[in-house]
């Protein structure tokens, strides 16, 4: 049971809050894990974020999360969804992490999109003007058609009702990394030394299976890639999410058991 006591920190994606992992947290808690799902800076529900959100960088989010992990004082397991998956990679390159579970992760600097749709999405946002300097309010019909397309109508609306504005700068750094002179999301894959599970939804258009596969391939033998048939982007809450969480738990059990065996040999 000692291995199971590692804290699990779940990092949400764009336009969300820690609430997005409520189901996962309950399931992991039932298996003996201590879990946390902090809100990123200015992502609290029912509070209009300050204008500063628009200029909040992925580096700011990463620094905040580093401070959170410092307070925990233990080597964590990180689970990240979408943009949160990119933040999890950034953290694992900076500090010791026991394991990473990346759910439909956004790709770091240098990883090209795998599909025309991903290119078109980035181009459409770029044509909207200087979005990188301002807050981005969620566009519900876009989210419904893409990120939440596999969620039943009644459940989809309840998720959309909880969406919050996002940082234009962080979105720019994630979707338009080739134009980011600061290379905010650049990661040397050699700095990420923990085991990694990368999971893609076979129907995901936001972060396509090809893109997620490219993320996994950066980490060579340390990463396992899984593509889940019938699933889209909202792997943390669309119907059948429980089997994805169960897959993650089983993988973690194997990783921690192997770690314990190696330590005892």
Annotate each language-model stretch with its function.
Residues 13-16, 82, 202-203:
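Active-site glycine-rich loops that stabilize anionic/oxyanionic intermediates
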Residues 29-49:
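Conserved alpha/beta-hydrolase
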Residues 192, 198-200, 204:
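Short beta-strand/loop motif that positions the catalytic acidic residue
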Residues 117-162:
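Helix-rich cap/lid subdomain of alpha/beta-hydrolase
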Residues 79-84, 88:
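Gly/Ala-rich beta-loop-alpha elbow adjacent to hydrolase catalytic centers
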Residues 222-265:
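Catalytic active-site module of serine/aspartate enzymes centered on a nucleophile-bearing elbow/loop
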Residues 96-133, 170-178:
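Flexible "cap/lid" loop of the alpha/beta hydrolase fold
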Residues 205-211:
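Conserved alpha/beta-hydrolase "acid-adjacent" motif
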């Amino acid at each position: 049971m000692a291995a199971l006591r590692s804290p699990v920190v779940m990092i949400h994606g764009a336009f969300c809050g820690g609430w997005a992992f409520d189901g996962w947290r309950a399931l992991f808690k039932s298996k003996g894990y201590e879990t946390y799902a902090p809100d990123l800076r200015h992502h609290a529900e029912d509070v209009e974020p300050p204008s500063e959100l628009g200029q909040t960088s992925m580096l700011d989010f990463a620094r905040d999360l580093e401070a959170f992990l410092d307070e925990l004082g233990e080597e964590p397991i990180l689970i990240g969804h979408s943009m949160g998956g990119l933040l999890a990679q950034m953290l694992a390159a900076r500090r010791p992490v026991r394991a990473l579970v990346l759910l439909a992760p956004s790709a770091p600097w240098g990883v090209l999109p795998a599909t025309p749709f991903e290119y078109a999405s980035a181009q459409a946002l770029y044509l909207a003007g200087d979005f990188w300097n301002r807050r981005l309010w969620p566009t519900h019909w876009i989210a419904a058609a893409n990120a939440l397309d596999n969620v039943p109508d009644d459940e989809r609306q309840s998720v959309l009702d909880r969406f919050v504005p996002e940082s234009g700068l962080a979105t720019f750094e994630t979707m338009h990394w080739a134009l980011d002179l600061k290379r905010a999301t650049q990661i040397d894959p050699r700095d990420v030394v923990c085991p990694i599970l990368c999971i893609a939804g076979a129907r995901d258009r936001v972060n396509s299976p090809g893109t997620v596969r490219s993320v996994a391939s950066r980490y060579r033998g340390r990463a396992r890639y899984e593509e889940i048939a019938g699933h889209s982007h909202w792997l943390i809450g669309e119907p059948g999410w429980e089997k994805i969480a169960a897959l993650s738990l089983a993988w973690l059990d194997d990783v921690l058991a192997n770690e314990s065996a190696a330590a005892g040999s």
